[in-house]
């Protein structure tokens, strides 16, 4: 994301990144979906991490030990039971992240983009909510609703369906990210 590193290829971290680690990063966002990851604009002093679902919860603090020192860490995933479970697990691994677009208000705003199919196009089914100690009260409320299907039409809203401009506006306005948001310079990844 950072302009200084924007011309470099994406990095895949398979061993702890301790040498030549970035020292000027003030903002980090962990993204669940590759399309959204690729649509994120350049942002000074920021890094975008493709969490790739539950993969982010397994070894992120081992692979990126400096991540917890970044002052502003955001997680944005699918609005479904798995996405919220991933958020909970990230926090319980020691990542002090704030979520965006993962609460009941966001669900109601983007419900029109919902689906009843999982990532493999198989029908979603309701489930019994599990403990999620890393969620806030509002996030837990949405998690339970998405598990049980109570008073909602869809069990899943994919992250990539939400306009990227809406997310970057939230990052700018609510989390003070230095993102330029003039006109239509930020691509909209809502292509489905």
Kindly give the residue locations of the regions a language model identified.
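Active-site glycine-centered loops adjacent to acidic/histidine catalytic or metal-binding residues
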Residues: 78
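Nucleic-acid enzyme cleavage-core boundary/entry regions
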Residues: 1-72, 82, 88-101, 105-192
